[in-house]
Each structure stands twice: as structure tokens, then as C-alpha cells.
Amino acid sequence: MSDTIFAPASIPNLREVVFEKIREAIMTGVIPAGSKLSEIDLSRQFDVSRTPVREAIRQLVETGLVHLTTRRGAYVLLPTAKDTLDLYEIRTALEFISVEHLCANPPRDILLQLRGEFDEVSNDWDANRFMTMDVDFHTTLSKHANNSYLDFMLERVGAILQICRHYAIGNIPKVSSSREHIAIIDAILSRDVGRAREKMREHLENTRDALLEYISRHPEVAIPKE
């Protein structure tokens, strides 16, 4: 696992520090989906006692990133087909609200900057960079939708989906995916709510289907890892 992520925690609020470090490891795939979280191992890796690790795991359970069972203990959420369908159903509804708000008052300079970045990555593909850009894209849209509750809910759903998307990235068409983002941006800049919703739906459905395809071809993803 990454030496940087598991660098010793020295900030006073150890529980929050450990929480952020474990969350980062989960979100970036350093701790794979389905992995069991051992308090002993994590406390050794972070060079802290088991108490802040235990508290951090409880906080991760509250976010939905980690499941806690009596028999197996704590483990990272598994990207099952049912999880994927349910989460994308919720996310689509929330993203529709986001683009509706943005069409009413589009942050033009920010959207044009995002557009240029996606245009650039379509010509020079980098999977890791693209994943970061996609997260930043949806985060930027939600933050400028002028609804803090919407932003909070999208962040929560997006964090869970981020675990799954590491598996889907190889199934996403490179150029077409960048064009999907550009099409959404153009619709918002034109204040065309109907088209913005349509393009957002297409984008989310394509990402969802890429993940579902991977899960169907790799059922071992849903096998818990001890």
C-alpha cells in the first residue's frame, strides 16, 4: 500500500486524520473494494492506537463507504450490480436538479475552463487524470448549483460510486466520454435545461453501464477479501 497514504498521523485530532487517510485509500483503490479493515493492521500502519482507528471506521460506516457486520467485521463496500443501479438512480435525479440550477445562472468562466480541459484530455488520454477530472467536473457543477444540501448529497453518493468506478474506467470510450462532458457544458452555457438533462442522463447511463458490464464479466469483484 502507498507509503504516503499510510504516513504516521501526528495531528491532534487523530480520529479525523485517520478517517481521511482511510477514506483516501478507499477512494483511490489503494484499499480495494471488498477488503476487510483490520483495526490492528491499520493502527500499525498509521502508528496510532486502535481507538482512533475504531472511531474512524465507525465514521466510514456512516458515510456508506464501509459495511459493518457481526460475523465479518468492517469491510469496504462491494460494487454489486444492485448497488450500482440504486446509486445511479439517485445520482441522476440529483444531477438533474444541479443542471437545472446551473442553466439559470451558468458560471461561464469556470465552465469554459472545464471545457478546455476535457477537449485537451480527449487528444492525450490519461485514465487517472480523466477520473480526477470527472470527479472535479461533477463536484464543480454541484458546488455552483447554489444548494448546499444538494452538494452534500451528491458528494455522499459520488464518494460511494468512486469506489466502483476504478473498475469501469477501462470500459469507458475515451473520446466519446470527453465529448459527453463537453456536451453537458455546452447545454448549460446555452441555458438549455432539456438538453442539459438529456446529455447528463446519457453520460451517467454510459458510466453506469460500463461498470455493470465489468461486474458481469468479473463476478470475483463481489467476493469479500479477507
Name each model-derived stretch.
Residues 162-171, 206-217:
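Amphipathic C-terminal alpha-helical segment
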